[in-house]
Amino acid sequence: MLYDLFKLLAYSYKIIFSTETIERLLQVIPHNELYSSPIKGLFLRHSDQPFCYEDIIQEPSICIVLSGEREVQLGEQCYRFDNQHFMFCPVNIPMRGEIKCAEPQKPFLVMSMKIDIESVSKILLANPNLVDDVQQGD
């Protein structure tokens, strides 16, 4: 089932971003909105207040919460992501979410990088040994 796939791919991973780096980002990105960076497919979302989002389609992406916590609901399952757990979404998937705690002194900040499935497919087709390595567990 797709939810099980998401669960398997939502790896726990300690992501370390220095407080200094986050403070610099907060000085240059717009507050309380989604910022599309000059790097194609890289987005930053800032909020200093709680908010919910419903009935969205999450595109293939990797999302790293730099500050705060994000709660995502997929069907009956609920997943929490923070600066020690990132979200990997390999396919388009309907979901809803909530940012419960965010304030000016402790804003929510997430960095999201879209995955270009077509480019990944081309890389895998051009390098079949990559697929073989994964299948063999290398």
Model-derived regions, located:
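A short, N-terminal "cap"/entry segment at the start of jelly-roll beta-barrel domains
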Residues: 1-38, 51-52
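N-terminal regulatory/effector-sensing and dimerization cores
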Residues: 35-134
